[in-house]
Amino acid sequence: MDALEEESFALSFSSASDAEFDAVVGCLEDIIMDDEFQLLQRNFMDKYYQEFEDTEENKLTYTPIFNEYISLVEKYIEEQLLERIPGFNMAAFTTTLQHHKDEVAGDIFDMLLTFTDFLAFKEMFLDYRAEKEGRGLDLSSGLVVTSLCKSSSTPASQNNLRH
């Protein structure tokens, strides 16, 4: 069986709902990577990141920010998906997502999780605040540069070629 036959054979076993799910995830990746979405999310986070503190206690002020985020970002994504996939249903997709969560790229799933999981939402803001305040992950102290060339103990001026 050649590669084309194998691919065709595999496709015949995937259901229409799987293909639809894959199409939505592909569109989601495009939307999330788009400059317009990145700007929308960055502006929202710039507006509120200083409200969030890395403590166990969750302030009452977090709730309206969370609700505003859901309204703004989820609405934007849903509108974009409706433009690209006529008849798209966010509620149905969310249900399907729970069954396919292991198949979705981590960054997409994490972003979608910020709509329903408050702790994921708060963590996103804490990470953003740490980055803005220069407290991001610093790997420089763990890096060591080693020359792959063996250095000679003889200075270059004394290293004459002799015939």
Swiss-Prot record:
Localization per record = Cytoplasm; Mitochondrion intermembrane space; Cytoplasm, Cytoskeleton, Microtubule organizing center, Centrosome; Nucleus
Q: Which InterPro entries match?
A: ARL2BP, BART_dom, BART_sf
Q: Which GO terms describe its molecular function?
A: GTPase regulator activity; transcription coactivator activity
Expression tissues: Widely expressed, with most abundant activity in brain, especially in hippocampus and cortex. Also expressed in lung, cerebellum, liver, kidney, retina, spleen, muscle and heart (at protein level).
Q: Name one GO biological process term.
A: positive regulation of tyrosine phosphorylation of STAT protein
The protein's UniProt keywords, in alphabetical order, are: Cell projection, Cilium, Cytoplasm, Cytoskeleton, Mitochondrion, Nucleus
Q: Does the keyword Cytoplasm apply?
A: yes
Q: Name one GO cellular component term.
A: centrosome
Q: So which domain of life are we looking at?
A: Eukaryota
**Main function:** Together with ARL2, plays a role in the nuclear translocation, retention and transcriptional activity of STAT3. May play a role as an effector of ARL2.
What family does this belong to? Belongs to the ARL2BP family.
Please name the PANTHER family in this protein's record.
ADP-RIBOSYLATION FACTOR-LIKE PROTEIN 2-BINDING PROTEIN (PTHR15487:SF4)
Oligomeric and partner information: Interacts with GTP bound ARL2 and ARL3; the complex ARL2-ARL2BP as well as ARL2BP alone, binds to SLC25A4/ANT1. Interaction with ARL2 may be required for targeting to cilia basal body. Interacts with STAT3; interaction is enhanced with ARL2. Found in a complex with ARL2BP, ARL2 and SLC25A6. Found in a complex with ARL2, ARL2BP and SLC25A4. Interacts with STAT2, STAT3 and STAT4.
Name it.
ADP-ribosylation factor-like protein 2-binding protein
Gene name as annotated: Arl2bp
